[in-house]
Amino acid sequence: MRKSKLHLLPLSSKRVLVSTSLIMLLSGSAWAVSSQETVENGDAITAVPQQRRTVKGIVKDANGEPIIGANVIVKGNKTIGVITNLNGEFSLEVPSNATLQISYIGYLNKEVKVSGNQVSFNIQLEEDSKTLDEVVVVGYGTQKKANLTGAVSSVDFEEQTKSRPITTVSSALAGLSPGLQASSGSAMPGEDNTTLRVRGNGTMNNASPLIIIDGMEGSLNAINPQDIENISILKDAASCAIYGARAANGVILVTTKSGDRDKIQVNYSGRISFNSPTRMIETMSNYADYMELMNESCENVGSGTLFDQKYIDLWREKSKDPNGVNENGVPNYIAYPNTNWLKELYSGGMIHEHNLSVSGGSNKIRFLLSARYQDNEGIVANTDNKPYFVRANIEANPTQWLTLGTRTYASQMDREVGDFSNANTFLRQSTAGTYPEWNGSFGYPECPDERATANNPLYKLARNDGFKRYNRFNTTLFSKVKFFKDLSWDFNFNYNRYIYETRQWGVPAYQTRFSDGVIVDGITPPSQLSTSFGYESNYSYTLENLLNYHHTFAQKHDVSALLGYQEFYKNYYTVDAAKKGLIDESLNQFDEATEMTSTKGATQDYATRSVFGRVNYAYNSRYLFEANFRYDGSSRFHKDHRWGFFPSLSGAWRISEESFMENTRTWLDNLKVRASWGKLGNSEIGNYEYMSVYSTTNAVFGNALNSALYMGAIANSLLKWESTTSVNFGIDVNLLKNRLSISADLYQKKTDGILYRPTIPYVFGTMTAPRQNLAKVSNKGVELSLGWRDNIGGVNYSINGNFSYNKSNIDAYNGTYERTWVEDPNNKLTGGKWEDNIGKVSSGGTTPIVEGRMMNEYY
């Protein structure tokens, strides 16, 4: 008799087995390992072979039509499976008492037990309405995707984190939603300076969208990407009006994960990736060519040559033998360098990250605990970034009518003081004739004719050291009381704290002309080194009370209502100081310096109060209506202009639900047209601009420098809210069992009374112009998104794409731009000249604000 022998696994296999067993044990799963190797001897366990049988069947849809390409597999053993043929039929050899799992895109999965002597099956799948029943997060609640009347995009961010490394959430949003523009202004590791715009720039002030994390305002930089489950982008006034004054530029809603009530899971993920420039511009790294071009440039403007020809010839000669040495024994590639500074500055960096989470629960409680660590080396020296994240989401249900919980997260980010902007500035001042670094010293321009302003970027970056530390803590305590089946009360309290600390100090470094060993720029003595300290702290709290009502009358009339009240307060505090003259170069603490060079500090605060509400009505999931309002008050305005009212109306018609569309339901799953109108506000200005404020300065009195106060800005107590009026028309289509989805929107929004400072005559001196409600901006555009999901050979796949077009125009500012020809008899060449009023009617430098022109148009 042939027997199956228990045998030892190789060491590597045992390691995998033990670690996997531990993970499965913690997650509450059971598993087994078997071996089919058979031997003739040894202490043995009898192997009883499983009986197998061939089963056949046909898979049909809800209308009785065969389904081609449906997956049929044995539950628990995905290696035993087949797909249905052109007639929807299948044949499969399976073990006795097996369970078949049948699946197909657009239909609910189904399980069929193989028992007794049955070998033939007629299987009918039910349509999956998940796409239409999908719940989308909206302001202060959720709605079925099919019932949305506004312009809302939803991103499954959990899927994004599985497919690619994500260092910052904001940069990862690029390309995921039509109408959302994400542009990075820096490649600094961990720096969340990605500019987000929803449907263009709606104002000349802060045009960033409102960020809401689990119902409370927050920062995308403070959240672990692995904790995010879903992100919703609210784009039109109907969707945003519930947030009133804070939502004129759109809203990004972030929902984090929660634990499952029926199991405990322990998850770990780690990733190592490498970061490097994908493409760099070609630089002038041949110094002889550079010198010739500079001489040609000087000749073109009528000045003498900059470089003597003998140095050009010398560089070309020495470059032929880079490994040779000069008379001082220095290699030619160092004494006569041809440096490519882009390659020296921008190198590759490694990123490694680790994520650990524990989640689970029961019928009384559910929880998620997570932690994340990342080390991003950056591609420029001294730009290392190390963020740490922790989170606790806990929800308890002590009774059927009461829910209590907390959503708490914290983060710390440690960064070195290296800066891309400084590196790029120094790069523009560098030349190929300087060798970067050798024998502990930084190189100096080797050619005597080189300009004195020529830099060694590495030397400039190395002269400062220090750190930057960002700490964030955010906690929300929430409760929900169900008075009746249809009526509930939510109370939320949020506390947010942010602390930023930076310390920087000078580091001794020197430059050497390597060709002859002369130290040109010596080590800075400790008495000339400086140390500085910066500290910024702010805290805020939010109180919210929400009443929710929902009821369905006569099975066709679905009514829901929301009424809420909110208070918000925020306080800022900053202090900065710098000292000079270190006692010793190794002692860089603030107390070790001898001379105070600067000190400054400030504190500010502001507060808001709001009442808001929403009413939804749906008739038979066919005719949909929604109305929102928000009444906001802000301390940033005078008491006579403090409050603003912001309403919205929207409606939708699901044409696919009409009886006359009955014949299209085999291929048309959803056809909905939408329309919305709304008004939003904006108060993103300074905290005290309606009041006269004083600033400090230094002034000379009696041959001495004295501190003084002066009026820094002209007050304007008539400031009012900016207001943005938006109109949106949209259509949503789902076809072919929800495999194909199409969504299109056409919109226009106009912002009136934009709060901006005009240019004022120099007679006002250093005074800042008063902010006024003086500008108008309009945006109009089109958005289109397409999606396809299907199954091929048991493999699910999806393809998504989107297109956006937006035009932003300045309708009113400070007068129109005029350009006229003025005759000038003294101008013998042309007889006149062009004159314009650009300095009087515009502001903004290289991207001027000019009435009648586009926003952010380069001059």
Show where each model-derived region lies.
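Short, acidic, small-residue-rich periplasmic hinge/interaction motif at the N-terminus
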Residues: 33-77, 99-108, 119-161, 199, ...
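Short, acidic Ser/Thr/Gly-rich low-complexity loop/linker segments typical of extracellular
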Residues: 78-89
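Short acidic/polar hinge/loop motifs at secondary-structure boundaries
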Residues: 91-93, 171, 214-241
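Residues embedded in well-ordered regular secondary structure
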Residues: 154, 159, 164-166, 176-195, ...
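Extracellular/periplasmic, surface-exposed regions of secreted and cell-surface proteins
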Residues: 159, 208, 352, 387, ...
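Conserved small-residue
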Residues: 267-331, 791-859
